């Protein structure tokens, strides 16, 4: 059997991080079996569905590195097919027209509540003849759900889940305006698309029971189902805005690499031994829905940062440079940095990357670590830098300025030799010199190695910054 999975988002907003993991699991399972993953846009809610959201979903999938087969399928464009199936179910005696008015339905619900029953439709039109239909009322179509026993959802993650049929009632499959409900549209589309495996969030389990009833009514084979646990926040609560970023686009703007996010997401609910860093090739080779956990996975930014830091260290400098440039328009002060990135500063930034990527967990930290290159002048000092540039620090700068100025070559070896010789001669620890020098060059107490900074900035810029601090720093 050829495996065909599908990712079926609703285009009402960005690609949610939970949706990205669902897409990843579908993609991996299809790839593992040499099959296909299709993309279906569930856009039947015309009021909330937008073209911008469709674009955001497709862009999000592309960025995170998940491809789909064929063109995206619009559920809305298949409305006529959904209506055709609903009418066929009526002809086959598996569904019926219901003419109940809103007032009658409200009365049914009130009676059910008063009697302590679930507020379900009571099947009033289930066996009535159409000749009894009132004039001027457009009917809905309801499925004839089984009244006795239970509907069983056979799930590869959750096991067999039983739903008493008395709790499911004769639900609507076609509205009075001729539009299908979600339940019907999903079943028809999954059948027509040849979907063999449905991998989605476990919040769809109850839907799965109702969809099973429709599959059985049509005599169609039910795809293998795997309902995966939702992603929760670090506090164990359902993921929401208060837990931080929700959309894939936000993670991109926060400086996460797509390979790192894939690696992190695959470990949310699935694992392969104790492996933390997993290549895409190994994911495809190892992934199986039978290994997905039942319990909800918790979002852990510390772990995500650690994984992202690994991928940053393993990336080439050019790739990091390109990735960083691509997110600048999306981050705070990014446009200011773009304005300053002339040919000279681009070269300096690229040259700085090997010196700062070892300590960077995100691209934002990489940008921050290189900010001394394109910072505004006069240089703004952080509090620690101000402390380092006190009276003693200024005295150091005044002493080493002529030494640096007299260096015949501006390379790390020459600069290292000159300053260490001075420190030894003055019986000073090298850190006593390096700390105020670093503060004068970068405005911070931490940075890449001070000799690397000197070389990156170049002779003139370095001497100008040192001289500027000698002349302007106030003792605190």
From Swiss-Prot:
Q: What is this protein called?
A: Glutamate--tRNA ligase 1
The UniProt keywords, alphabetically, are: Aminoacyl-tRNA synthetase, ATP-binding, Cytoplasm, Ligase, Nucleotide-binding, Protein biosynthesis
UniProt lists the family membership as follows: Belongs to the class-I aminoacyl-tRNA synthetase family. Glutamate--tRNA ligase type 1 subfamily.
Q: Name one GO biological process term.
A: glutamyl-tRNA aminoacylation
Q: Which NCBIfam families match?
A: gltX_bact
Which subcellular locations apply to this protein?
A: Cytoplasm
Q: Where is this motif: 'KMSKS' region?
A: 238-242
Q: List positions binding ATP.
A: 241
The GO terms describing molecular function are: ATP binding; glutamate-tRNA ligase activity; tRNA binding; zinc ion binding
């Amino acid at each position: 059997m050829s495996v065909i999975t599908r990712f079926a988002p609703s285009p009402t907003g960005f690609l949610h991080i939970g949706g990205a993991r669902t897409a990843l699991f579908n993609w991996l399972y299809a790839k593992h079996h040499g099959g296909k993953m299709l993309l279906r846009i569930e856009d039947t809610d015309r009021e909330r569905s937008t073209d911008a959201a469709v674009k955001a979903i497709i862009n999000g999938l592309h960025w995170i590195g998940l491809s789909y087969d064929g063109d995206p399928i619009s559920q809305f464009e298949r409305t006529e097919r959904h209506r055709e199936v609903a009418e066929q179910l009526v002809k086959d005696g598996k569904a019926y027209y219901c003419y109940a008015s809103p007032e009658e339905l409200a009365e049914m619900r009130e009676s059910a509540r008063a009697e302590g029953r679930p507020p379900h439709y009571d099947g009033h039109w289930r066996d009535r003849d159409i000749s009894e239909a009132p004039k001027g009322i457009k009917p809905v179509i309801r499925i004839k759900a089984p009244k006795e026993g239970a509907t069983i959802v056979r799930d590869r993650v959750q096991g067999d889940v039983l739903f008493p049929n008395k709790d499911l009632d004769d639900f609507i499959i076609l509205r009075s305006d001729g539009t299908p409900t979600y339940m019907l549209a999903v079943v028809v589309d999954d059948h027509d698309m040849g979907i063999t495996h449905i991998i989605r969030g476990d919040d769809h389990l109850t839907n799965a029971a109702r969809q099973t009833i429709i599959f059985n009514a049509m005599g169609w084979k039910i795809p293998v189902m795997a309902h995966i646990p939702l992603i929760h926040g670090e506090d164990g609560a359902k993921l929401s805005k208060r837990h931080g970023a929700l959309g894939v686009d936000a993670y991109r703007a926060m400086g996460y690499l797509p390979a790192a996010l894939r690696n992190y997401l695959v470990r949310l609910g699935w694992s392969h031994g104790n492996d933390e860093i997993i290549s895409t090739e190994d994911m495809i080779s190892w992934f199986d829905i039978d290994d997905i956990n039942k319990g909800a996975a918790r979002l852990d930014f510390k772990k995500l940062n650690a994984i992202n830091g690994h991928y940053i260290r393993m990336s080439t400098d050019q790739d990091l440079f390109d990735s960083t440039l691509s997110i600048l328009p999306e981050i705070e002060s990014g446009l200011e940095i773009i304005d300053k990135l002339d040919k000279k500063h681009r070269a300096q930034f690229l040259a700085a990357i090997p010196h700062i990527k070892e300590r960077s967990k995100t691209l934002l930290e990489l940008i921050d670590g290189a900010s001394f290159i394109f910072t505004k002048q006069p240089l703004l000092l952080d509090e620690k830098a101000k402390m380092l540039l006190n009276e003693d620090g200024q005295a150091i700068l005044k002493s080493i300025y002529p030494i640096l100025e007299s260096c015949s070559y501006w390379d790390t070896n020459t600069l290292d030799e000159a300053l260490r010789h001075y420190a030894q001669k003055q019986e000073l620890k090298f850190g006593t010199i390096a700390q105020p020098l670093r503060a004068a060059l970068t405005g911070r107490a931490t940075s890449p190695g001070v000799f690397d900074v000197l070389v990156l900035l170049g002779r003139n810029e370095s001497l100008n910054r040192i001289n500027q601090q000698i002349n302007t720093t106030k003792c605190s």
